């Protein structure tokens, strides 16, 4: 088996689908084209986290049943998508043990009360019943109790950055936590601490809406395995994201001009 550390821009969903337009499908096809993977093994055996379309990743991973050691620049050249990067790989005998997952969300700073958000976030840290802050998956029976290790919130004039660390997460759990904290920061919730206690209880059944997927990135899935990164692929990733940053800065300038002139 080989474990691959991967990154992607969020324009595709993650998990293998019949239509073939997902992160896993693109990586599998590249490995097949290189002759490293047999078609019967095209579905990954294991992964670090399943993400929805719109959610980016810098440190997810996939595990494939394969014997040949891959040359990563060659794999990268075969990827038929410019928003996926195979950053590193390592041969393994057993599946990795996950220590924690780290998500980060970037919110526009609309005069949020950041200190109130920080105070409220402390109520979410620890082991709680998170069913009301997740999307119910009727096809699977999952224990809704999860443990959050830490939540860190920082801000500047334009953005609020929220980092969430946990053992594992329910479907849409991070995005719903973000929406809750954002609404608290906008003073949309009268008694934040009391409401958090309510929404973390099994008696509350209303749930809570999610924030948009586009602000979320899976920063890392920390495991007990160290994976060496390929310098060529890292350069490719940095160049691509730098180009995106420059385009976004130009767009930001245009937006500021329009808003200041009207």
From Swiss-Prot:
Gene name for this UniProt entry: truA
Protein name: tRNA pseudouridine synthase A
Primary role: Formation of pseudouridine at positions 38, 39 and 40 in the anticodon stem and loop of transfer RNAs.
Family of the protein in this entry: Belongs to the tRNA pseudouridine synthase TruA family.
Active site residues of this protein: 52
Highest rank taxon of the organism: Archaea
GO biological process terms, semicolon-separated: tRNA pseudouridine synthesis
Binding-site positions, substrate: 103
Enzyme Commission numbers on file: 5.4.99.12
Gene source species: Methanococcus maripaludis (strain DSM 14266 / JCM 13030 / NBRC 101832 / S2 / LL)
Reactions listed under catalytic activity: uridine(38/39/40) in tRNA = pseudouridine(38/39/40) in tRNA
Alphabetical keyword list: Isomerase, tRNA processing
MF-aspect GO terms: RNA binding; tRNA pseudouridine(38-40) synthase activity
Pfam families: PseudoU_synth_1
Leading EC class: isomerase
């Amino acid at each position: 088996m080989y474990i691959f550390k991967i990154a992607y821009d969020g324009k595709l969903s993650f998990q293998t689908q019949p239509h073939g337009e997902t992160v896993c499908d693109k990586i599998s096809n590249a490995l097949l084209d290189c002759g490293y993977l047999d078609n019967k093994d095209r579905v990954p055996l294991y992964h670090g986290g399943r993400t929805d379309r719109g959610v980016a990743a810098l440190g997810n991973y996939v595990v494939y049943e394969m014997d040949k050691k891959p040359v990563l620049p060659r794999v990268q050249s075969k990827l038929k998508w410019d928003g996926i990067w195979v950053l590193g790989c390592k041969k393994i005998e057993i599946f990795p043990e996950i220590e924690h997952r780290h998500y980060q969300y970037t919110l526009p700073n609309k005069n949020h009360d950041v200190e109130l958000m920080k105070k409220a976030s402390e109520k979410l840290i620890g082991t709680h019943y998170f069913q009301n802050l997740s999307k119910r998956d009727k096809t699977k029976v999952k224990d809704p109790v999860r443990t959050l290790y830490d939540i860190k919130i920082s801000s500047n004039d334009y953005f609020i950055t929220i980092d969430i660390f946990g053992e594992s997460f329910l479907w849409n759990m991070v995005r719903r936590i973000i929406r809750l904290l954002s609404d608290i920061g906008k003073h949309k919730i009268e008694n934040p601490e009391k409401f958090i206690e309510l929404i973390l209880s099994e008696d509350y059944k209303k749930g809570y809406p999610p924030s948009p997927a586009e602000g979320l990135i899976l920063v890392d899935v920390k495991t007990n395995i160290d994976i060496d990164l390929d310098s060529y692929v890292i350069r490719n990733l940095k160049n691509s994201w730098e180009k995106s940053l420059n385009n976004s800065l130009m767009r930001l300038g245009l937006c500021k001009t329009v808003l200041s002139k009207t």
